[in-house]
Amino acid sequence: MFIHDEVSVPELSTKNINRKRFYQTPEGKLYPSITTVLQKRKMAGLMEWRKNVGEDVANYIARTAAHRGTKVHHMCEDFLNNMESNYPEKWAEHKKNFLPYVLFGQLKPVLMQKVNNILAQECGLYTDKYRVAGRVDCIAEYNGVKSIIDFKTSRKERNDDWNESYYIQASAYAEMFEERTGVAINQIVILVVTEDGVVQEFVKDKGEYLPMLVEAIDDFTTDWEKENEMVHSSSDDVAT
């Protein structure tokens, strides 16, 4: 059984503006989601990949990967919530999703051996310092160290340098959580399970990625301001 010592944080609502996701804080402030902020960093590689494999193949892979990732994430969340032992009939529903369930089965021993004392799961967070928000997968002890833990699926094993955006995102969650609760989190953990059953563990210190977080937020803010200027300019032209 996993031990839960969950910290209370306020719920956040979401709002889409110009196809970008924002979170509204209890004080009424709108902050972009960290995934939206980091989208630009991923775009060049994605565009090149789409060009290489073709749009139809790319769309199929993206759809199946998103479905698989969502299912595995839900299984991890429910397992850490002790559903398998406390609500076996509900847990049995997961077995209907064969491939995600098999992938989760590879992750399960890692969760059992290394994760405990859970502080939060699927939790909305924000930071006034960085003016960004998001939803974290899991905050818990990993090998006895308080950590931001993110679950990922992949078709093949990932090189460490492919994960930079993951590390920046997890570092942002660490900053958000400390600002909201006063609990410092320095370790970030990305767990990746591949279709051939390999589990990769990437353990980092958030300090290395905070400068990159600031850079990504500055880039997003600059682009967002330019985009809004163009919208306002077009509106003024129509009005005249």
Outline where the language-model segments fall.
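Metal-dependent nuclease catalytic cores that hydrolyze phosphodiester bonds in DNA/RNA
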Residues: 1-133
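Mg2+/Mn2+-dependent nuclease catalytic core
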Residues: 119-230
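Glycine- and charge-rich intrinsically disordered segments
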Residues: 1-10, 226-240
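Generic serine detector
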Residues: 8, 13, 33, 85, ...
